[in-house]
Regions:
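Extracytoplasmic
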Residues: 1-57
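Extracytoplasmic/lumenal acceptor-recognition loop(s) of multi-pass membrane glycoenzymes
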Residues: 4, 39-112
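Generic structural signal for short, flexible, solvent-exposed coil/loop and linker residues
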Residues: 11, 39-41, 114, 122, ...
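Generic alpha-helical secondary structure signal
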Residues: 16-20, 66, 123
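A Trp-anchored, charged/polar loop motif used as the substrate-binding/catalytic surface
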Residues: 21-24, 111-123
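Generic preference for hydrophobic/aromatic residues in regular secondary structure cores
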Residues: 35, 93-97, 147-149, 165
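Aromatic/acidic, Gly/Pro-rich catalytic loop(s) in extracytoplasmic/lumenal soluble domains
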Residues: 116-168
Length: 168
């Protein structure tokens, strides 16, 4: 069966087998490290047993929101929409917003998009306990911002192509 663009089945969306492969590749107990997602909902990694710094959550400390904002402050500065959304409207959505994606957390492998220049503060991400970035898109300036590409994961039964970056 051919699936429709950006309309994955339940199995394709959560991609359990692929996330098991990622966990095995990392080779540590999932409780011992934290991840963030780009271009895909953090609920996917949470569902698969990963501990995330990003989430869709109703209540969390305002201090945490301010610390998380520092990770992507330069990215928010590129987009008045995202800045306003994160600061004033989308309090429950503690996501890494990327200006190029324009509110799309469904960057399935059908999309042929790359992130040329991500403005991410990896030192702040690391300070918050972030160890890995699960990105649905290639980040071309990854080395410049302190991210090391470890491996690209893709499977026929997954909606995603996941670029696994380590925060260095």
């Amino acid at each position: 069966t051919q699936r429709k663009l950006a309309v994955p089945s339940y199995q394709e969306f959560y991609a359990g087998h692929m996330h098991q492969e990622i966990a095995q590749f990392i080779g540590k107990d999932q409780k011992d490290y934290r991840v963030v997602s780009i271009g895909m909902h953090p609920a996917i990694t949470q569902y698969n047993g990963f501990y995330t710094l990003d989430a869709y959550v109703g209540n969390y400390p305002l201090e945490y929101k301010h610390e998380f904002r520092k990770v992507m402050i330069a990215e928010l500065d590129k987009s008045p929409f995202y800045r306003d959304y994160f600061d004033h409207l989308g309090g429950s959505r503690c996501y890494l917003f990327v200006e190029k994606l324009m509110y799309n957390a469904m960057m399935t492998k059908d999309h042929n998009i790359v992130i040329e220049e991500l403005a991410l503060d990896s030192a702040q991400l690391k300070k918050m306990g972030g160890h890995y970035v699960f990105s649905a898109l290639e980040i071309q300036n990854s080395q410049d911002i302190g991210l090391k590409l470890l491996k690209v994961f893709e499977e026929p039964d997954s909606a995603w192509r996941i670029y696994l970056y380590e925060v260095s």
